Amino acid sequence: DRRQRQMCIRDSSWADAVTVQERLIRAGRGPKRPGDPDFSGPMNYAYHFDAARFADYLRDISIAAGVTRIEGTVATTERAPDGDIAALMLTDGRRVAGGFFLDCSGFSALLIGKTLGAGLTSCADYLFNDRALALQLPYDCPDAPVRPYTLATAQDAGWTWDIGLSERRGIGYVYSSRHCSDEDAEATLRRYLGPQGAALAPRALRFETGYRETQWIGNCVALGLSAGFFEPLESTGIMLIEAALKMIGDFLVPADRSAREAAARSFNRLMTGRFERIVHFLKLHYCITRRTDTAYWRDNADPASIPQDLQDMLAQWRRRPPSRFDFVVDLETFLPPSYHYILYGMGFETRLAAGERRYPGAREAHEAFARVRAAQTGALGALPDHRSLLNHYHARMGTAPAKVSR
């Protein structure tokens, strides 16, 4: 019986064994049914939204809540005698005074970097990618299938993303300039696109992977790109923004400088920990690769490019599964299940030191795998085609797809 269970699991991919989603996405199914309540459904799912329209939405609800919107371009900053930022001077001569500032100025880091001098800790020794090419590829016909997942494909010096939206696909190639010229990168992207993309010109992006260890200085906190950046991973950036805002809301005590300085130290320690753990999680995608065909993948697997803490965890995970004690919950953006998916989805082998006897949950796991297989069959019959589901919501909202994807 035990041998049969092992053979059954070996015949399945990790994703197929532990999730219902694997079979559903390959069948082109959407994550919910038209009659399900908004923002919920039988499958976990995320959104690709129009960033410009979402920004307009946030602007409108903020103004309705009493926020004053001032539109302008920052020219310089004015410092107070104690070193705090006293005001922003705009290019049109206006002065915007404030008691506390959030630096959302992106890569330029106008306040936290250029004014207050917080340096950027580079992660280039661990995470090699520093450039990207991106473009939008329209569908051939309006009713073309919409892939219900993001497709990431390993390339010689990086990876391509391929995101299916209502009217188009968003496609790009993120790569390491140390391992690939810009010309070779564009050639790789064009091979991926095929003839459909021959007339399209990709947009080139350059970035430095890293983060600021002091994201809160005085009366200023960096948020978003001014705090740090890891590849084109918008969802990770949004999670970090939310985590920072929640901490600021809890930590900030008005009119108490000593409490504010203590809060800044706590905030910087916690956010630095989060960024460090994200470095480990991202590096995990690369360092356990079995590819050895290009210098990019060989360098990624070189122990010299793997943070020591991650090396220590991998050494243990080769003899036991990840434990909740490997993770400091308050510092984690990615929790243990995320590590399971990367490790075992990429074929990482854990040879249990004492076999299954040491792990009393092994039998329950096999029973759970059987329940997953049964649920897969039911879900395939219950969930609609992804394009049909999107068309349903566009019709319900009275909005044409072209209005909601750019």
For each of these PLM feature ranges, what is it?
Residues 20, 46, 156-157, 168-169, ...:
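Extended, composition-driven regions rather than compact fold-specific motifs
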Residues 37-188, 245:
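Predominantly flavin-linked oxidoreductase catalytic cores and closely associated redox partners
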Residues 1-9:
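Single conserved hydrophobic/aromatic residue that forms the stacking wall/gate
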